[in-house]
Amino acid sequence: MAKLAEEMNPEGSRYQLLLSCPSGLSPSQVSVDFSKSHDRIPRQDPGLEDSISQVWEQRSQGNSSLFNGQKFRYGGYCLDDDDGSTNEVPHVCLRLGLTDYRTFVGTNLSSLWEKFLVTSEDDSVRCRHTSSPLGNGAVIETSDKKIIVLRRSNNVGEFPGHYVFPGGHPEPTAVGIDYHQLENNVQTGEVLNKKVTQEMFDSIICEVVEETGIPASSLSSPLFIGISRRELNVRPAMFFYLKCSHHSDDIQRLYSSAEDGFESTQLHTVSLDELKMMTSRMPGCHHGGFALYELMLQRLKNTKETSLIAT
């Protein structure tokens, strides 16, 4: 089955790792620069820009579940490592703007998506004309070391029927953002940036609870492990690692009461080897999430080996 899916859509599972944080970063090691300067820049092509509303109208006709809403736009990142050390735990600043689902459908998900790209080695420049809303995903380990994977329903907008990690999007409205405020007040801007940073971590907990039924009290604090981008549609997503105190046998019972269970048809708790076999049936951004998890595991292994040698 996995091989067949890959043959049907080989592009769909390809990915690029934009940022890897294998040590796992806590909220104190992540910050956000939320600014209009990180918003999408319109393409200097009136016909292409007009296609955004046309694609949206076509997609929304007869689809009552499709609605527009604000999203955070991924505009790149910077690493704050001013001391020049080789510390593996840097401080990451995410550059975020504002976009909406309508523009996402009309740029990234459009059949014309490649025409919105610019030839550049700089990812933020290459994708400056795309909506690029920042998605999120959670690699969750149960108490018996199984990983939770969902199979998407056929009613979702992207990759129906594929395997994914629980996740969704951090939401601007969760921190009271409907539009860009005047940024004359530096103090107000700093407060807002802190709220947006916290939303990056709070939102993944909310998504996990809503999609799996696992209570928040059973989850560890999320650790940010990086950002991947699906090559098809240049779709970015940030990934987190969480531990769950429940045994895998308990997860199915919890899933039956999940608030957003309609977004998926099945929940699987799988071993690492089983998960590897499923990656060709994952969207590229989630395949990249698995790669980020592998890098985290490799670092843990290397750290343990180094510790043993030292003793």
Swiss-Prot record:
Q: Does the keyword Hydrolase apply?
A: yes
Span of domain Nudix hydrolase: 131-298
Query: What tissue specificity does the UniProt entry give?
Result: Expressed in roots, stems and leaves.
Q: Which cofactor does it need?
A: Mg(2+); Mn(2+)
What EC numbers are recorded for this enzyme? 3.6.1.-
Q: Where do we find the motif Nudix box here?
A: 192-213
Q: Which InterPro entries match?
A: NUDIX_hydrolase-like_dom_sf, NUDIX_hydrolase_dom, NUDT22/NUDT9-like
Give the protein's biological function: Probably mediates the hydrolysis of some nucleoside diphosphate derivatives.
Q: Which family does it belong to?
A: Belongs to the Nudix hydrolase family.
| Name of the protein | Nudix hydrolase 9
**Source species of the chain:** Arabidopsis thaliana
